[in-house]
Amino acid sequence: IAQNTIKEMTRLGADISNIQAIVGPCISQKNYEVGEDFLETFLLEDQYNMRFFANGKTNKYHFDLPGFCLQSLRNAGITNPEWTGHCTYEDSDKFYSYRKSTHLGEPDYGRLISVITL
């Protein structure tokens, strides 16, 4: 999404050196446990994506979503992307987390929506 957005912004006349990007609240690596199928999907795209995974429990990994997003922004030409540092799983009093709700056995979970226009 980020790379396509930046591509469209530059197509519309934006100077890439003036584009700033911040990755908003999202789940942090220590709380984002994924299976081998998730890992394999990323490695098929690029073997170097292994750097975004840490070993977890047997046959499980922890995915660095903010790190992956930051690198995607850098790959698209953004020189200094940032992350707010907010983990939606840990900061559940501020943000909704489907993963945390299911881990706690809650019957429902909140929803978030973002709208981006150019």
Where are these regions (language model features)?
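Active-site microenvironment for binding and transforming phosphate-containing groups
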Residues: 1-118
